[in-house]
Amino acid sequence: MPPHAARPGPAQNRRGRAMAVITPRRERSSLLSRALRFTAAAATALVTAVSLAAPAHAANPYERGPNPTDALLEARSGPFSVSEERASRFGADGFGGGTIYYPRENNTYGAVAISPGYTGTQASVAWLGERIASHGFVVITIDTNTTLDQPDSRARQLNAALDYMINDASSAVRSRIDSSRLAVMGHSMGGGGTLRLASQRPDLKAAIPLTPWHLNKNWSSVRVPTLIIGADLDTIAPVLTHARPFYNSLPTSISKAYLELDGATHFAPNIPNKIIGKYSVAWLKRFVDNDTRYTQFLCPGPRDGLFGEVEEYRSTCPF
């Protein structure tokens, strides 16, 4: 540039006034396109952030209760207040009557029927009824037609008890039951009955035999998620001839677990037991409510071996 030449300035009209710079149409189009792409990317990032912040289990319509903890599951009662209703022996069809425990909160819940063992009454499993109901289930603990009823008879009576809750109980009970989500449990011969009914009703969501007894050792026809709880000092239904072979015979294609209590006898399920309560609730929550928040307690499961309350635990994890 010559030493005294004027520097280029804004475009001027004939009168020396500055003129507006006109952006070419192609450049305006490019700027608009970049702005739109930036806005879309920002919106996508916002939606992704919101999605990641939302709980993964929020879509489960069966989820009930707060996030579970060891302390919550090991406590004597869960987060729900419970009411109870008597099922009269004279009004019950196909079983000996019982007691129904249900959450007071007006909602729908899975339903569970529990049978006592040989010579036992519902009183021997009453603690389980109230404990499980307090975690968000409708539960019936039954008396059998006679205390000497055998396992297959107890299977039929468990089935009748489920039907009673769905069809014949009070409206307070019936209105709270989701009849598509049913489970069974039982102690001793009631545990054998639980296995028998599970082999006959693949629509059940869960089965939990407790120190089970049955002459049949092959349960390969069961298609229901099953947790078997045995006791290492059981001399009535020794785990070597009952709980363990029962578990081993269940197909590996189903969700199943075996928990053996350490230092416990055949009658461990008849009094409040922290381990039985905790893992029974976790199993029912996982498979009746499809609540994966409880998987953490089942997979990998409790620590077993020396100095623990569990002698052995094995399963078909992951669930």
UniProtKB/Swiss-Prot annotation:
A GO cellular-component term linked to this record: extracellular region
Function: Catalyzes the hydrolysis of cutin, a polyester that forms the structure of plant cuticle. Shows esterase activity towards p-nitrophenol-linked aliphatic esters (pNP-aliphatic esters). Capable of degrading the plastic poly(ethylene terephthalate) (PET), the most abundant polyester plastic in the world.
Taxonomic lineage from the root: Bacteria, Bacillati, Actinomycetota, Actinomycetes, Streptosporangiales
Activity-pH dependence: Optimum pH is 8.
Technological use: Shows promising applications in the laundry industry as a cleansing agent, as it is thermostable and tolerant to surfactants and organic solvents. Has potential for application in biological recycling of plastic waste products.
GO molecular function ontology, one term from the record: acetylesterase activity
Localization terms from the record: Secreted; Periplasm
Active site: 188 (nucleophile), 234 (charge relay system), 266 (charge relay system)
Keywords: Disulfide bond, Hydrolase, Periplasm, Secreted, Serine esterase, Signal
Record-linked InterPro entries: AB_hydrolase_fold, FrsA_esterase, PET_hydrolase/cutinase-like
EC number annotated for this UniProt entry: 3.1.1.74, 3.1.1.101
Residues that bind poly(ethylene terephthalate): 118, 189, 213
Coiled-coil spans in chain: none
Keyword Secreted set for record: yes
Regulation of catalytic or functional activity: Activated by magnesium ions. Activated by calcium ions.
Annotated S-S bridges: 299-317
Keyword NAD: no
Thermal dependence of function as given in the entry: Optimum temperature is 55 degrees Celsius. Optimum temperature is 65 degrees Celsius.
Gene for this chain: cut_1
Stated name of the protein: Cutinase cut1
Spans through the membrane: none
Catalysed reactions, semicolon-separated: an acetyl ester + H2O = an aliphatic alcohol + acetate + H(+); a butanoate ester + H2O = an aliphatic alcohol + butanoate + H(+); pentanoate ester + H2O = pentanoate + an aliphatic alcohol + H(+); an octanoate ester + H2O = an aliphatic alcohol + octanoate + H(+)
The family this protein is said to belong to: Belongs to the AB hydrolase superfamily.
Annotated signal peptide: 1-58
